[in-house]
A protein has these predicted regions:
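A beta-strand edge to alpha-helix "cap/lid" segment located at domain peripheries
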Residues: 18-34, 83-179
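A solvent-exposed, acidic/Ser-Thr-rich amphipathic alpha-helical stretch
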Residues: 38-41, 55-109
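A generic structured-segment signal
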Residues: 3-8, 84
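Short, low-complexity N-terminal intrinsically disordered segments enriched in polar/charged residues
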Residues: 2-5, 18-64, 174-179
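N-terminal polybasic/positive-inside topogenic patches
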Residues: 8, 13-16
Length: 179
């Protein structure tokens, strides 16, 4: 449980818990309720984090008791999420992802995404999916429901060619790529 302010404490900063104002920040702005702009920012921040392929960093965006459905796998808790992501990125090599907001309301965001990767035999895939996200008041994701389909592609059919890491600003979106 996060600490709360008492009447003798200094005034709160935008109802942010005390813990979130130190260097171990538990706040993950933007915070709900979302607007079109903040939902888009949240999706881009998630995309950027996933493109690092750093399981520990990505897992910090989720509550400690976050619940996931990823394809047919059900996960509970940040440790399980981190272990899942480590397995995922050992298998999905040269992973590059683009996310795009589909809808949002209050503390929920729905995104569609596509990512490209290859296996250890050099077979390329484009994975298409949808995610439904629900956030707590501190901007941590407490629920992630993901449906994903893998499409084998030829290496020459790839659309994501930026260097590994963050998708460059100005790179076409999913819609602009016709995906």
């Amino acid at each position: 449980m996060l600490p709360t302010l008492t009447s003798s404490d200094p005034a709160p900063q935008d109802d942010v818990p005390l813990l979130s104002r130190d260097k171990t920040s538990m706040n993950r702005p933007p915070l709900p309720p979302f607007t079109a702009q903040t939902a888009s920012e949240k999706a881009r921040l998630a995309e950027d984090a996933w493109n690092t392929r750093d399981p520990a960093r990505v897992a910090l965006a989720y509550t400690t008791d976050s619940r996931w459905r990823n394809r047919a796998e059900f996960l509970h808790g940040r440790e399980a999420i981190e272990a899942f992501l480590a397995r995922k990125w050992r298998r999905e090599l040269d992973y590059r992802l683009i996310k795009e907001v589909w809808a949002f309301h209050d503390s929920r965001i729905a995104v569609r995404f596509a990512y490209e990767w290859h296996d250890d035999s050099g077979n390329w895939f484009r994975s298409y999916g949808n995610e439904n996200w629900e956030f707590d008041q501190y901007g941590l994701m407490r629920l992630r429901l993901a449906s994903i389909n893998d499409l084998p592609i030829k290496e020459g059919d790839r659309k994501y060619h930026w260097p590994l890491g963050r998708r460059p600003d100005g790179h076409p979106s999913l819609s602009e790529l016709g995906l």
